[in-house]
Amino acid sequence: KSVRAGKFTVEFIHVNHSIADSVAFAIHTKMGTIVHTGDFKIDSTPIDGEVIDLARLGELGKEGVLCLCADSTNVERPGFTPSEKVVGATFMRQFQNCDERIIVTTFASNVHRVQQVLDAAAQCGRKVAVTGRSMENMMKVSTELGYMKVPKNTLVDINKLKGLPKNKQVIVTTGSQGEEMSALYRMAFSTHKQVE
């Protein structure tokens, strides 16, 4: 898909990233094409089934690119980054083998990772509570837009966790980078109002 923006035509090219529906831009100008990838990852088995459009990126390369602005975390490391599905398999192993409460922290924007937490919890008979404003907002919006499918009877209010055995609890929260006001930080310092 592409749109006109003044004298430019901007083409959207699907890429994989922790944020659903990420795209690279091919900006077609009279001087040549500028490709801006944004942060991306090559994942041949992404959670949503939508693989990066390497074919289109290759076509653009053959046509000639005036400027490439590319960003990919850990690009300087040799080898490949594992698929996000590897994380889901790890969740399953941990959820099956843990006899206590599980707390998972991730970026609120990582919808696919949260989906894998929900799926693993449901398969292991655990209930999931969400805490952290950005995580709560992401869950609401991504569910409404169809990016996330919450397994039936899996999600519970954070205040209802106290009535469940700890081996049936999963908390998904913000704070994966140690932010001082995040829910995880407050849990770690026993200042979270709903989690002991």
Could you tell me what each predicted segment is?
Residues K1-L164, S176-Q194:
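His/Asp/Glu-rich metal-coordinating catalytic cores
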Residues V172-T174:
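Short beta-strand segments
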Residues N167-Q169:
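Short, surface-exposed beta-edge/turn micro-motifs
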